[in-house]
Amino acid sequence: MSLNDNFVYMPPQGELSILYEDDDLVIIEKPAGLLSVPGRLPEHHDSAYYRVLEQFPNAKITHRLDMATSGILMFAKYRDAEVAVSKMFQARTVKKNYIALVQGKLPDTGRIEVPLITDWENRPRQIVHFELGKQALTLYEHLEYDEAKDVSRVLLTPITGRSHQL
């Protein structure tokens, strides 16, 4: 039995907020709980990508966020813009940051460096595997600590781009 056997996809309803638009790009706010791209099963087709296609039929997604992650998604309106953005991601000129809440109090700064591999029984989850995993590096900066809840707010900066590395 895998962790996904009882999963029921219930994406948030409502229109996506457009944060920015120009001749080449449209940037939206993806809510937590919505897939960035459609899943394999028909009941997993509702996604930010398909919702954006309703307004921008030629749109191409330039990157993805995990379903549980809320944040900014960028879409290229045309193939030329998609190629240009893809080159920026490959050259690592695009900087990605995430804010997360984690249990406990962390040092002011740090790095999380572990080798990750797909947990095939529980896809899309990743597991740490020191022999077969691919190195994943995330830098963090401690922003705030809530002593009552024992929770830290941290700024995460992934250096590598492994799936589900955060």
Regions found by a protein language model. Give the residues of each.
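RNA pseudouridine synthases
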Residues: 1-165
